[in-house]
Curated annotation (Swiss-Prot):
Coiled coil: none annotated. It catalyses: 5-(2-hydroxyethyl)-4-methylthiazole + ATP = 4-methyl-5-(2-phosphooxyethyl)-thiazole + ADP + H(+). Catalyzes the phosphorylation of the hydroxyl group of 4-methyl-5-beta-hydroxyethylthiazole (THZ). The lineage of its organism: Archaea, Methanobacteriati, Methanobacteriota, Archaeoglobi, Archaeoglobales. It comes from Archaeoglobus fulgidus (strain ATCC 49558 / DSM 4304 / JCM 9628 / NBRC 100126 / VC-16). GO terms for biological process: thiamine biosynthetic process; thiamine diphosphate biosynthetic process. Keywords: ATP-binding, Kinase, Magnesium, Metal-binding, Nucleotide-binding, Thiamine biosynthesis, Transferase. This is Hydroxyethylthiazole kinase. It comes from the Archaea. Substrate binds at residues 49, 195. HAMAP family: Thz_kinase. Its EC number is 2.7.1.50. The gene is thiM. The keyword Membrane does not apply. CDD domains: THZ_kinase (cd01170). ATP binds at residues 124, 168.
Length: 268
């Protein structure tokens, strides 16, 4: 993707999020809920954090995108997730799945696969979580991963489920099943705070609310988040200040800041 086109689209979509304040319905984990809500507000969207079965269909009806995060699972949450995804699919609401810990336990892996097969538009996870969706074995410890995915693996997951995949790691891989991009931005500080991956999902879901090319929306969200992370790290003295500065930088992000630092390459 040409950087000039990405800059133009990013300028437009940041402005559209600010103008329309789209509702992003989150069914997410307890650990990340506060941070996810705050980062969604910072980018300009409007978060709803609810998993009550009785109101899911109504909330999906007013949402512009749906984020599913399986970080803290139980049977009630699993039922809420499936209800929400089915409702979103029937209403044309785009869905992002964050398969937290998939590959670490059978429950997480089976839930992630069930949601993916139900029909979502973007899957965002670390590279071990993404590989688990191919039933490939790796080393996934809780929400952490020591697995490195190849471009071909990420492309295969995207083609298998017919969606966009964002596989995070030292280098982030993004694929729609045809092309594969590698993004070399971000900071190691993102790996030192809880909910950093969950917040990334919220930012991407916010772009999905206004940009229906989900490969582009994923690139936009990932680029904004990683560059904001770099900017935050430069002014932070530790992990607590980094978390606050990350949200600050997302609230001030511009296309110019992103393109100035962006290291993006199409590899397939």
């Amino acid at each position: 993707m040409h950087l000039q086109r990405l800059k133009e689209e990013l300028e437009r979509d940041i402005a559209r999020i600010a103008e329309f304040k789209p509702v992003v319905h989150h069914i997410t984990n307890y650990v990340a809920m506060n941070d996810s809500a705050n980062i969604t507000i910072a980018i300009g969207a409007s978060p709803i954090m609810s998993f009550a079965h009785g109101e899911i269909d109504e909330l999906v009806s007013i949402a512009s995108s749906l984020l599913i995060n399986i970080g803290t699972l139980d049977e009630y949450i699993i039922q809420a997730v499936m209800l929400a995804v089915k409702s979103a699919k029937s209403k044309g609401v785009p869905v992002l799945l964050d398969p937290v810990g998939s590959g670490a336990t059978k429950l997480r892996t089976s839930t992630a696969l069930s949601v993916a097969e139900e029909g979502v538009d973007v899957i965002k996870g670390n590279q071990g979580e993404i590989l688990s969706l191919l039933r490939k074995e790796g080393v996934v410890r809780g929400v952490d991963s020591k697995v490195t995915a190849e471009a071909a693996d990420v492309k295969e997951v995207a083609r298998k489920f017919g969606l966009v995949v964002v596989a995070t790691g030292k280098e982030d891989l993004i694929s729609d099943g045809r092309s594969v991009y590698v993004m070399r931005n971000g900071t190691e500080m993102l790996g030192r705070i809880t909910a950093s991956g969950c917040m990334l999902g919220s930012v991407i879901a916010s772009f999905m609310a206004v940009q229906k090319d989900f490969l582009l929306a994923s690139l936009e969200g990932l680029a904004c988040y990683n560059v904001a992370g770099e900017l935050a790290a430069e002014k932070s003295s530790g992990t607590a200040s980094f978390r606050s500065n990350l949200i600050d930088e997302i609230s001030k992000i511009t296309a110019e800041k992103v393109i100035e630092r962006l290291n993006l390459e199409r590899v397939v």
